[in-house]
Amino acid sequence: MSGTLVLIATPIGNLGDLSQRAVEALSTCDALCCEDTRRTGLMLNHLGLSGKTYIVVNEHTEHDASREVVERLLAGETIGLVTDAGTPGISDPGERIVRAAIASGLSLI
């Protein structure tokens, strides 16, 4: 069974603004696609979450990262997509990940 790509909006400023739904999604994902592991790590540390695998997605890695994400989703993993701030797919390299998942017929939330 295929996994699911979960788009997770993150606070633009205050980490206290992170929704409960986002916290639940972050805690259940097998891996997280992110632009900057430092910023994502700060957010996860704030939530008391650790041990997540990161897939770095930026203008230099988005092609290879897209392929890796699709392979992992096809293997049944749940992968979260976060940005440094805001909703994934708006002014960030996550768009390619979303397009690859859709093209492969995978589930998105």
Show the residue positions of the predicted features.
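Glycine-rich loop at the start of a catalytic domain that most often binds anionic cofactors/ligands
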Residues: 46-51, 68, 73, 94-95
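Generic recognition of short, well-ordered alpha-helical segments
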Residues: 17-21, 67-68, 92-96
